[in-house]
Amino acid sequence: MAEKKFVVDTNWCITLDKVDEKFYPEIIKNEAQIAEWREMYAIHEIEGNLTTVGYSEPLTIEFLRQNKNLILDTRHFSADFKERLIASIDNLDEQTGGLLIHSENFQALRLLNKKYKESIDGIYIDPPFNSTYSEILYKNNYKHSAWLSLMQDRISQSRFLLCREGLITIAIDDYEMPKLWELMNNIFGYDNHLGTVTIRVNPKGRMTARKISAVHEYTIVFGNSEYSYIKKLPVNPEDKTHNYKLDENGVWYLPVNLRKQGVDSEAERADGTLLDRYYPIYYDPKSGLVSTKRKLPVTILPIDNNGHKRIWRRSKDVIDDMYARGEIWVKEVKGEYQVYFKFYGGLDGKMLQSIWVDPECSASDYGTKILNNILGERERFLYPKAPFAVKQNILAMSDKRNAVILDYFAGSGTTGHAVLDLNREDSGNRKYILVEMGEYFYTVTLPRIKKVIYSADWKNGKPQNRNSGVSHIMKYISLESYEDTLSNIELDDDKHQLAMKLGDEYMIH
């Protein structure tokens, strides 16, 4: 049995709106914290005006009051300050929206099982692909058996954390897709496979000497039980890509062509007779009048551009009433008259489709570039996923605005970024748990989350909108490493006592 790993360091990142102002005098004297704010948030560029206070040296309490989305990191403060601050926050467990764990993920999963057993709503992971194309900490080019062993141990352990209705989604490429498919079927069962999505993540294609240039990856989705299902993606009627309109009563509708297309739209039966929904609609271009009973100058039949007879989406007996209510109209499209109607529906969501070609799924354009703009450096982390694609996966896994999402191959922290973005968009209270073993935990993963909490938009490492921050508490901990165990690490007494107290009492809070 693997030896228990101890929590060797525990800290919190807390937005100032959640910090009692009695701590402000101590905060403005903390040079390490202020230096981080200058480097991370460029607070020295904040200028004052008639109503606001700008940056100054020394920093003022009023400046803190007016910039309450700044994130305090307890690692810059004494053990005494940390204890007093944490003790002053009511309902710390409920208010903590994120947990970051610097650890080998198998040990972290075992530790998480103490508090989160059967309570995680969704797991999203982007593990090593076991190919030369994914350069990450785990040694790629494993033999199949070694890679499968790595994955089986972690996926099996993480299943204990999923709630009954929970889902797990895994990003993978062609190289290990067949083996992963077999593994997931063995762990979750064939009947709990809810679909596989093909995502265009590299529109330019992957350089190759002999093979087809791959532009895609996959996301495999499995449910934890028969009660698991894919959620519909929310539809925002104000999003112009959906073409929703407001009627005169302020109700959203979608303009839809009355002529049906696709499955079950053929008007002719096998014997050559026509279905009842193949009928003429009469139209007067001058008055705009539409009727099925009164013959008018123009006769419109549901015949498509290829001359195929289709059917209307509505029966003949309701058309005149719909016109009287202002729900039917005709417009000329490319020289032909088309009949449209107001569709009052669809806002309950849309089904997730198996192919994603959205430009926002591009890892280079919407993964790497976004991360570079946040961190202000190029290529500090290779091949990060696009937040949009991860957000889609999260929404498909859970429609709960207080869902708990786990990623135990956290990498650059895209999953945490996606959760924060979703909460910012719909005022949700989702929580994220990220596990990462790499040293870039402190140079990429943690800084990224701290920056995304502060602002939604970044360019060249600087915030572009200081008013887009979210109120938040995030906790990050480090577990004892295998090397620490071998070395029989000894902590400074004060730090050891604090780590034991906070790491035990508040470990997963």
Locations of the language-model features?
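Conserved beta-strand signature within the Rossmann-like core of class I S-adenosyl-L-methionine
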Residues: 166-170
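Active-site-adjacent "gating/activation" loops or surface patches in catalytic cores
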Residues: 90-92, 104, 120-133, 347-385
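Conserved P-loop NTPase mechanochemical-coupling segment
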Residues: 84-100
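Mobile active-site "lid"/loop adjacent to the S-adenosyl-L-methionine
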Residues: 121, 128-150, 165, 175-176
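Phosphate/oxyanion-binding active-site loops and adjacent basic polyanion-contact surfaces
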Residues: 101-105, 143-151, 381-389, 441, ...
